[in-house]
Amino acid sequence: MPVCVMMAELDEKLLLQFETQELEAPGGIATPQVYSQLLVLYLLHNDMNNARYLWKRIPQAIKTANPEMAAIWAVGQRIWQRDFPGIYSAIAAYQWSESILPVMEALRESTRRRAYGLVAQAYTSISAEDFAAFVGYSVEEAVKGVVSHGWQADPNTRMIMPQKPDPPPVSLVPNEQQLARLTDYVAFLEN
């Protein structure tokens, strides 16, 4: 089983465990560690709605007493605003605890993968400086990264030409099934 699949399953189990701990907390208020872990896992899964609602549920006293939680939420705000350079700077700006650091590193890499995918879909060419800010690398590291992805980098113009991703396979619906579906729609419209 690939490592990324195993990590995703582990993250899902951790997420469910922390959600259960929050729900079963005595008095309805969980520990700051549970809230912090749950918030950062929501961010890792890009589940911004649950992250926002969790932030609203956390008592103000816990938010103010735990600066790490505020730093996690600062990262979440940058994700919400789709401020990719801000995400990397917010992650780098805080000295994370041992329990949060691995998840933040995974979040940084996940954000980079998403940025690569977005650039590949949206751009035919992008300046090396803009791309470097978008993926949180120096210009030299960004150029090395795109070359390793099979993209082209022009050192004269300092432009990067992404390779377009392969289109997702189109699932062909058998003709009989398509005809049955069309018949159902027409029958619905007539009645």
From Swiss-Prot:
Assembly and oligomerization: Component of the CSN complex, probably composed of cops1, cops2, cops3, cops4, cops5, cops6, cops7, cops8 and cops9.
Function according to Swiss-Prot or TrEMBL: Component of the COP9 signalosome complex (CSN), a complex involved in various cellular and developmental processes. The CSN complex is an essential regulator of the ubiquitin (Ubl) conjugation pathway by mediating the deneddylation of the cullin subunits of E3 ligase complexes, leading to modify the Ubl ligase activity.
Gene3D superfamilies linked to this entry = 1.25.40.990
Mind telling me which Pfam families this protein's record contains?
Answer: CSN8_PSD8_EIF3K
Q: Work out whether the entry's keyword set contains Amino-acid biosynthesis.
A: no
Q: Which GO terms describe its cellular component?
A: COP9 signalosome; cytoplasm
- Species this protein is from: Danio rerio
Q: Which InterPro entries match?
A: COP9_CSN8, CSN8_PSD8_EIF3K, PCI_dom
Q: Where in the cell is it found?
A: Cytoplasm; Nucleus
Ranges of residues in domain PCI: 6-179
Protein name per Swiss-Prot or TrEMBL: COP9 signalosome complex subunit 8
Keywords tagged on the record: Cytoplasm, Nucleus, Signalosome
Q: Name one GO biological process term.
A: COP9 signalosome assembly
